[in-house]
């Protein structure tokens, strides 16, 4: 009877007899959360594994509106994936961080993180505490960075051949790899023109503007020292101006409007005539002031309130032989000013000759039946900026070409930041695995075990490269291990030839910063995921 009462009146008090059961259930929950987080994050890594390397596959992504993207750039794939699980979202952020830091290696970093998480699962199942795993991984990372730095070789920015090889390696895994002989030199030239090789420590990629224009093929891509705009020249008569004096205005060349709540009542035609005459005189006065400064090319910022340029103003500008390009986007203003040395003018009273930029030539160029481009070249006081014009037969090709060029530019930026190169083709990862395994033998206890697991996880990159290239991953990785054990540090997988060779001789190289950043960011993310033992939903 007393037992019945106890069971009816709710859960038993936590006496010494049944404290164990409740505590055991609590102890079980963090482990479940951890495994759930790890499996969600691993699912994301597995999704993009097949797109690693030159023989990697591409993904076709369709968004809600039906727009299609074809790419094998890890950051782009993950950005467009709808990931709901918070731990999986951490891997998307990881890829984004790698894209910002290095610009390349966005797929590798996620695959390394996935492999490290796989190792964590095995260690956790053996009963090793997450904190011990986390601290051991940090030790392994520090040792790993030393190993990578030892493997690297310094590079000079004057060594053009090496820069080209790095850019080509980056482009080889892209859809546009067959055009790497055109795009690599273009990327190297672009970066070299916007920096001073002797003193530069970074590259501001905003100084390299990529303009996309539909039509033609990727062979028609070009590098322009100057400014290229996709907007058309507004007045049809003037298409070429030599010794151009260029003004950039942010106000409208049209009749001023009343406030929203004001009205003008016109009772007869004489009053109407007066309004029109006043409008004509107002616009003519604006145009005369522009002409007085010596301006013969006028760029007008896009306006959302009213017409930036009325027909009447265009008529007067045409008469005064001033070339007009309207609808300049607000975000392009800074680049335009830096390129041609002009200053934006917000009011006609500030429009003076010293606000103008000057250039040898401003012209509208026809593109063999696929539209027109407006070019300004031969700037007299050029800022260190260049424009890359990307052409392609359809939107998908142009967008992928733009992403590929961006990656190649980022690779060269990495070399400017950290002037060291490292072999590609899975060579650094195999070397890491080998050297960290040796290092683990010098440690004792659980640490040794965890560092060994970290080392084994590094083999995922060469294994995936081999798998994607149609080679046998097990025999390839085993042979790589043997060759590295014999001291051949730069031996890696030559995907093009389908075998193992000295990767440095094949000129498959990547910046040290890409590998260092990938290893650091992947380890940090894995340590964060390991430390999470509960997920709390809030409203």
Curated annotation (Swiss-Prot):
| Protein residues bound to ATP | 53, 105-106, 174
Give the sites modified to Phosphoserine: 36, 184, 202, 444
Specify one Pfam family. Cpn60_TCP1
Domain of life of the organism encoding this protein: Eukaryota
Q: List the keywords (alphabetical).
A: Acetylation, ATP-binding, Cell projection, Chaperone, Cilium, Cytoplasm, Cytoskeleton, Disease variant, Hydrolase, Magnesium, Metal-binding, Methylation, Nucleotide-binding, Phosphoprotein
Modified residues annotated as N6-acetyllysine in this record: 21, 288, 302, 319, 326
- UniProt-recorded Gene Ontology molecular function terms: ATP binding; ATP hydrolysis activity; ATP-dependent protein folding chaperone; protein folding chaperone; unfolded protein binding
The residues listed in the UniProt record as binding ADP, with positions renumbered to this chain, are: 53, 105-108, 172-174, 425, 510
The question of whether Ribonucleoprotein is a record keyword is answered with no
Q: What is its main location?
A: cytoplasm
Read off the SUPFAM superfamilies from this record. Answer: GroEL apical domain-like, GroEL equatorial domain-like, GroEL-intermediate domain like
Q: Which residues form the signal peptide?
A: none
One GO cellular component from the entry?
A: cell body
EC number(s): the record gives: 3.6.1.-
Tell me, which GO biological process terms does this entry list?
Answer: binding of sperm to zona pellucida; chaperone mediated protein folding independent of cofactor; chaperone-mediated protein folding; positive regulation of telomerase RNA localization to Cajal body; positive regulation of telomere maintenance via telomerase; protein folding; protein stabilization; scaRNA localization to Cajal body
PTM annotation (Omega-N-methylarginine): residues: 19
Keyword check for Phosphoprotein? yes
Gene3D superfamilies per record = GroEL, GroEL-like equatorial domain, TCP-1-like chaperonin intermediate domain
Show the CDD domains listed in the entry.
TCP1_delta
Q: Where in the cell is it found?
A: Cytoplasm; Melanosome; Cytoplasm, Cytoskeleton, Microtubule organizing center, Centrosome; Cytoplasm, Cytoskeleton, Cilium basal body
Protein family according to the UniProt entry: Belongs to the TCP-1 chaperonin family.
Assembly notes = Component of the chaperonin-containing T-complex (TRiC), a hexadecamer composed of two identical back-to-back stacked rings enclosing a protein folding chamber. Each ring is made up of eight different subunits: TCP1/CCT1, CCT2, CCT3, CCT4, CCT5, CCT6A/CCT6, CCT7, CCT8. Interacts with PACRG. Interacts with DNAAF4. Interacts with DLEC1.
State the disease link.
Answer: Defects in Cct4 are a cause of an early onset sensory neuropathy knowm as mutilated foot (mf). The main clinical features include ataxia, insensitivity to pain and foot ulceration. The pathological features include a severe reduction in the number of sensory ganglia and fibers.
Q: What is this protein called?
A: T-complex protein 1 subunit delta
């Amino acid at each position: 009877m007393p037992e019945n009462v106890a069971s009816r009146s709710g859960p038993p008090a936590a006496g010494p007899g049944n404290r164990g059961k409740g505590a055991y259930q609590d102890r079980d929950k963090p482990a479940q959360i951890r495994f759930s987080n790890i499996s969600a994050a691993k699912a994301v890594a597995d999704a993009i594994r097949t797109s690693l390397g030159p023989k990697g596959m591409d993904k076709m992504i369709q968004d809600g509106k039906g727009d299609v993207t074809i790419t094998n750039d890890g950051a782009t794939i993950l950005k467009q994936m709808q990931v709901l699980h918070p731990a999986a979202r951490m891997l998307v952020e990881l890829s984004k961080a790698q894209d910002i830091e290095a610009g390349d290696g966005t797929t590798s970093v996620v695959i390394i993180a996935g492999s490290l998480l796989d190792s964590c699962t095995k260690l956790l199942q053996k009963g090793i505490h997450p904190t011990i795993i986390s601290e051991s991984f940090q030790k392994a990372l520090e040792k790993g960075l030393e190993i990578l730095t030892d493997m690297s070789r310094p590079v000079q920015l004057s060594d053009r051949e090496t820069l080209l090889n790095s850019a080509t390696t980056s482009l080889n895994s892209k859809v546009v790899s067959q055009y790497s002989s055109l795009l690599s030199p273009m990327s190297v030239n672009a970066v070299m023109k916007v920096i001073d090789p002797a003193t530069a420590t970074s590259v501001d990629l905003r100084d390299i503007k990529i303009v996309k224009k539909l039509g033609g093929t990727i062979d028609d891509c070009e590098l322009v020292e100057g400014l290229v705009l996709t907007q058309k020249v507004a007045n049809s008569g003037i298409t070429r101006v030599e010794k151009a004096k260029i003004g950039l205005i942010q106000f409208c060349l049209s009749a001023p409007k009343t406030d929203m709540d004001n009205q003008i009542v016109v009772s007869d035609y004489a009053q109407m005539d007066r309004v029109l005459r006043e409008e004509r005189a107002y616009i003519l006065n604006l145009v005369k002031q522009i002409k007085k400064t010596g301006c013969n090319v006028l760029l007008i910022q896009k306006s959302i309130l009213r017409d930036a340029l009325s027909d009447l103003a265009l008529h007067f500008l045409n008469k005064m032989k001033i070339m007009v390009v309207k609808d300049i986007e607000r975000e392009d203003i800074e680049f335009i000013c830096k390129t041609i040395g002009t200053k934006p003018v917000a009011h006609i009273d500030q429009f003076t000759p010293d606000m103008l930029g000057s250039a040898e030539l401003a012209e509208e160029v026809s593109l063999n039946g696929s539209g027109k481009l407006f070019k300004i070249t031969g700037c007299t006081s050029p800022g260190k900026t260049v424009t890359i014009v990307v052409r392609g037969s359809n939107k998908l090709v142009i967008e992928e070409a733009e992403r590929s060029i961006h990656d190649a530019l980022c690779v060269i930026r990495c070399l400017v930041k950290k002037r060291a190169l490292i072999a590609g083709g899975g060579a650094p990862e195999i070397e890491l695995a080998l050297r960290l395994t040796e290092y683990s033998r010098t440690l004792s206890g659980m640490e040794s075990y965890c560092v060994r697991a970290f080392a084994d996880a590094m083999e995922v990159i060469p294994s995936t490269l081999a798998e994607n290239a149609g080679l046998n991953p097990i025999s390839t990785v085993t042979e790589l291990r043997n060759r590295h054990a014999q001291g051949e540090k730069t031996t890696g997988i030559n995907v093009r030839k389908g075998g193992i060779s000295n990767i440095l001789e094949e000129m498959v190289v990547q910046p040290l910063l890409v590998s260092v950043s990938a290893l650091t960011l992947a380890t940090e993310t894995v340590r964060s995921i390991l430390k999470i033992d509960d997920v709390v939903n809030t409203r």
